[in-house]
Amino acid sequence: MLKLLLGDPNARKLKRYQPIVSDINLLEEDIFPLSDDALRDKTAAFQEQLASAGSLENQRPILDEILPEAFAVVREAGKRVLGMRHFDVQLIGGMVLHEGQIAEMKTGEGKTLVATLPSYLNALTGRGVHVVTVNDYLARRDAEWMGQVHRFLGLSVGLIQQDMRPEERRRNYNCDITYATNSELGFDYLRDNMAADISEVVQREFQYCVIDEVDSILIDEARTPLIISGQVQRPQEKYQQAAQVAQALTRAAEMGKDGIDPEGDYEVDEKQRSCTLTDEGFAKAEQMLGVQDLFDPQDPWAHYITNALKAKDLFVKDVNYIVRDGEAVIVDEFTGRVMPGRRWSDGQHQAIEAKEALPIQAETQTLASITYQNFFLLYPRLAGMTGTAKTEEVEFEKTYKLETTIVPTNRVRARQDWPDQVYKTETAKWRAVANETVDIHKNGRPVLVGTTSVEKSELLSALLAEQEIPHNLLNAKPENVERESEIVAQAGRAGAVTIATNMAGRGTDIILGGNSDYMARLKLREVLLGRLVKPEENHKPPVPLQRNAAAGFSEAPTASATPSRDSLYPCVLTDDTDQTLAQLARDLVKAWGDRALTLIELEERIATAAEKAPTDDPNIQALRAATARVKGEFDAVVKQEEQRVREAGGLHVIGTERHESRRVDNQLRGRAGRQGDPGSTRFFLSLGDNLLRIFGGDRVAGLMNAFRVEEDMPIESGMLTRSLEGAQKKVETYYYDIRKQVFEYDEVMNNQRRAVYSERRRVLDGRALKKQVIGYGERTMNEIVEAYVNPDLPPEEWDTAQLVAKVKEFVYLLEDLTPEQVQGLGMDELKAFLQEQLRNAYDIKEGQVEQQRPGLMREAERFFILQQIDTLWREHLQAMDALRESVGLRGYGQKDPLIEYKNEGYDMFLEMMTNMRRNVIYSMFMFQPAAPQQSQV
């Protein structure tokens, strides 16, 4: 109703951009005739104009003013370098991002290309732009691919990868535009704030940031803080004993009600992801461990038992984690990707290692932490793009102050979303999924099946193998994950069947008929791998492993093997082309050395050859000619195949379970029907699915009994669909509340973190260190006076002897100070007198230290301040964690836990800063530098 009265606010926003789009289109005619050098000169002219403005605030209006011309320049560069021209809707997307909003753009609408517009414009200020992606592979792909546009226009492009050294990171952060993952950016920020010297700092001040898949980073990952930790030793046998106790305890069939314990030793709340022992369970556990009390502070067991129970019932192998090389590796529940190097905290990971009988690694202590929410709010201007943001619009607005604008598609969507089919049991559902996959496959259409876990993807794989349907499997298992982009490149071919866990292939488009570009690159990689890549790097198979009907996995082709099965490519290459490739391999061995490259170096060279950027390198030119030749032969077949697939109905996407978030369901649907292609989607569900079981409640249980139908009969009911949507909304609200709570609690820490980090940075920069330390001393003198002097009593009754003794504890150089010298002084006079004494003593101390070596006093000041900040901040983080655990119980006493946390946390912070100041003053006066040794003649 409001929309009818006021009009659609999104349409109003889009209308505002239309005149600017017209301006850019008019400028296109002027820019088209310019030479490459003249186009590059535009960048220098823009930079000059912005440099004269000075501050960022003054530069903003100039950026808005030059936007049409800058966008027209990028559009022309895109055509020349990539052979891609920005559509009008992509220009609108660029403007939305430049204004610091979220642009919702559907799959296949070229989000990656859109990011080149605002990143170029904002990089002209010289203050750096960060383009953020969800994984290292996408960051590298975008830096190589889209980075060509920026490099062509004279800007420097940096890339941050997981295994880079600090000096490489600094060099890349100093580029005009830097591509990185969210976790690398966050961890570098934390490491910079733990640096012992300014030369170790790698990042510069933040300015502008564009996040690709913004919902994945700012919402899905917002519950997980970034933590840098150090190891602390805890007894390993406790984890092992707790795991044995957990196995012996029996789970209650249902939750207890009204304070009455259920039958069983412990209850599991899947919704809250918690386990609670019953009275009987406590008694049993204490008896098995031979202890009186699980909560005994001298020998605590409760924490270990709770973690062991959670490991047993809530952390499922091949769903939440996989076991690989003797380690439990976390699987990201949203993307289905493994996250090596990440560990659950508070001893939970150790409990899982004990459950799986793996070596137990040391527990960790937090040294520094920040949530993504507070990290990305450090950018003065933040923008993001995704295919699905509207469902989370409120959260983006409230938490990040980010508006969402839906950018229209370039072509009308032709996808059909078929109604859900709900089955009574899971077995019936999986049979139906397999049958529909077979039917669609036989019609010559490609099928993509999204599953929610590794285990489910393998179950479906077995069902399809029974029916002799060849298919590719894409899940978190290591043998599949490395083939991700290759499998997705094949997924649009006629009759292709791909099973993917949580659509891990976001980032690579599914192109109908197959992606001939990618297949040509794959062919070259296969031909060159054995000749050019170091032998130890050769273990990765160059082609996706395809699961065959009868034989399970095919043999992994080795680098030196003959070309892989032809079924991976659209056609067999002609003899001429095969000979050309063999000759190319021989020539490149002469030029680049026999097996002298790393795999990444080879891939980068093939990627460069596959694009259109100008190059003078004859080897890259030869590689480019060969790639074009292979692509040409593949194209002839792929184009026909694409036509067949289109006529058959395009890609069919099957969802096998509703995800907790509607957004993730929409992302899966969005794989079909990209850029106006035909396509269809359908979800198959069962009444035993997690979402309905955990959040659907008793209502769904009632429905199960009401439907007296055969197992293999699908149920289609409006009431059921509403129950599903209601359950999803309930889950989204539940997780939103958790994220909001994480954010509110971290907001308290954030204010403290900023104060500590800015103090630390001042010290690292070496700005006025002496003044800072004297300031600490003056405040310490004031605190001593306030502690030992009661202003309500007359001065003659003050305990000046105690006061003077305390001052001498901190400043031994004032050993001649006597109580008589301070008698008769008022409170303010006393403070001023002691401050003056401290300053004199500090000058004497400085003279003594500087005699040993000039500049030593400044080094000592920096060392002691950093040492105290780091030690006390680490202890403070532990104390704040403990406080957060305990304040929750105060809700029972009608007190707001958050307000209690804020108040007590603030008091603890003030106490920490006071201790830091006092410790620095004490350390500075006690500092006795060793005399330089005389060299013996």
From Swiss-Prot:
A GO biological process held by the record: protein import
Reaction(s) the record says it catalyses: ATP + H2O + cellular proteinSide 1 = ADP + phosphate + cellular proteinSide 2
Binding site for ATP: Q90, G108, E109, G110, K111, T112, D509
CDD domains per UniProt: DEXDc_SecA (cd17928), SF2_C_secA (cd18803)
E.C. number(s) listed in UniProt: 7.4.2.8
Regions annotated as coiled coil: none
UniProt cross-references to SUPFAM superfamilies, sorted A to Z: Helical scaffold and wing domains of SecA, P-loop containing nucleoside triphosphate hydrolases, Pre-protein crosslinking domain of SecA
Recorded family membership: Belongs to the SecA family.
Protein name: Protein translocase subunit SecA
Species name: Parasynechococcus marenigrum (strain WH8102)
Organism placement in taxonomy: Bacteria, Bacillati, Cyanobacteriota, Cyanophyceae, Synechococcales
